[in-house]
Amino acid sequence: MNYEIKQEEKRTVAGFHLVGPWEQTVKKGFEQLMMWVDSKNIVPKEWVAVYYDNPDETPAEKLRCDTVVTVPGYFTLPENSEGVILTEITGGQYAVAVARVVGDDFAKPWYQFFNSLLQDSAYEMLPKPCFEVYLNNGAEDGYWDIEMYVAVQPKHH
């Protein structure tokens, strides 16, 4: 899988933190997020899912994710935003790949991406959250175009 190394600014994000199987929590989180964004007239810069755990090592019921929108750095939570978190995705060097997800199989491109990164001779993955940015509305289009971000650092030879 093709990817490039990019220097990312930190992102300020607002949304929901969920724990449980991702195929359930991510969908539920975005439903909550859409209702909150619509009710508060927030104009998101990006729609993002943040993944904290490795599903090969963490039981499904303990998997953590955030479903969030990117907001300006000066953003404050509006009143009546119970359960909404305001947090940051750290900046730094990230490997970034683009994929098209068909049939809601989000795991497949991630595994392909990780396999490619494991073979990279110049960079290694960091134990930081990974995240994906949605480039379209898959609910309308029938597929999702996503950007996948994995924190990396140069390998020391």
From Swiss-Prot:
GO terms for biological process: DNA damage response; negative regulation of DNA-templated DNA replication. Inhibits the supercoiling activity of DNA gyrase. Acts by inhibiting DNA gyrase at an early step, prior to (or at the step of) binding of DNA by the gyrase. It protects cells against toxins that target DNA gyrase, by inhibiting activity of these toxins and reducing the formation of lethal double-strand breaks in the cell. Protects cells against the natural plasmid-encoded toxins microcin B17 (MccB17) and CcdB, and synthetic quinolones. Can also protect cells against alkylating agents that act independently of DNA gyrase, suggesting a more general role in protecting cells against DNA damage. Interacts with DNA gyrase. Interacts preferentially with the holoenzyme composed of GyrA and GyrB, but can also weakly interact with the individual GyrA and GyrB subunits. Pfam families: GyrI-like (PF06445). The gene is sbmC. This is DNA gyrase inhibitor. It comes from Escherichia coli (strain K12). SMART domains: AraC_E_bind. Induction: By DNA-damaging agents and by the entry of cells into the stationary growth phase. GO terms for molecular function: DNA topoisomerase type II (double strand cut, ATP-hydrolyzing) inhibitor activity. Keywords: Cytoplasm, Stress response. Its main location: cytoplasm. Belongs to the DNA gyrase inhibitor family. GO terms for cellular component: cytoplasm. It is found in: Cytoplasm. Residues 89-96 are annotated as: Required for interaction with DNA gyrase and inhibition of its activity.
